[in-house]
């Protein structure tokens, strides 16, 4: 597997943005933590003590976040903003359905030419009773969400691809992020002929923790 190009300036930029941005739709918030940073660091093959110490934070729409993109035959870590402007005034689009993205004017070119991966420690979802659940991988501290991005005057913006919920997600929502395995990252980014196959995949089963389960007196 090719690896991320070490780019200290991008890492510094991400650290600066993390300090700047503190902080209905499916997967409207996700989060990164020190394990996410460590995983990115492994792929980048660079050691940056400040990134290791990056405080856990939630990523909200309109904020900037680290993503993985293809760079030649390798991978690269960049910082892009979450959410694309919609066709209606002040509309923000943060997700795209994997089943129909290739047929949508807004997304089809990005699906073909500008795919990316969003690393996260987990993501949140709320049910109809407004109860919050946290979803994480069972076998890894980091999950990789498939996404696409487009270029705008104010910089690159991305959306998270979603698919039908699997058994672990169905009790809370009928949609979930399109989650990739680590070994699928490079093929998703570089092998266009496999795009349709990836868009139709069923994500792995996830751990779910409800908000009341996260509360403790100790």
Regions found by a protein language model. Name each.
Residues 2-218:
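Short linear sequence motif anchored by a di-proline
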């Amino acid at each position: 597997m090719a690896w991320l190009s070490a780019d200290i300036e991008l890492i510094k930029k991400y650290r600066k943005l993390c300090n700047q941005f503190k902080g209905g739709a499916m997967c409207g918030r996700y989060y990164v933590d020190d394990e996410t940073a460590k995983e990115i660091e492994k792929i980048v093959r660079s050691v940056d003590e400040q990134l290791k110490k990056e405080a856990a934070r939630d990523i909200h729409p309109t904020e900037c976040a680290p993503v993985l993109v293809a760079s030649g035959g390798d991978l690269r870590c960049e910082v892009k903003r979450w959410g694309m402007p919609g066709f209606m005034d002040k509309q923000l689009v943060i997700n795209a359905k994997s089943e129909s993205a290739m047929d949508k004017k807004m997304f089809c070119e990005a699906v073909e030419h500008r795919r990316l991966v969003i690393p996260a420690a987990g993501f949140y979802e709320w049910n109809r009773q407004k109860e919050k659940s946290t979803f994480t991988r069972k076998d890894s501290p980091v999950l990789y969400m498939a996404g696409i991005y487009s270029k705008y005057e104010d910089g690159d913006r991305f959306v998270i691809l979603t698919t039908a919920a699997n058994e672990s997600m169905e009790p809370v929502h009928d949609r979930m992020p399109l989650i990739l395995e680590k070994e699928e990252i490079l093929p998703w980014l570089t092998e266009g002929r496999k795009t349709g196959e990836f868009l139709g995949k069923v994500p792995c089963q996830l751990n779910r923790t409800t908000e009341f389960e996260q509360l403790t007196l100790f």
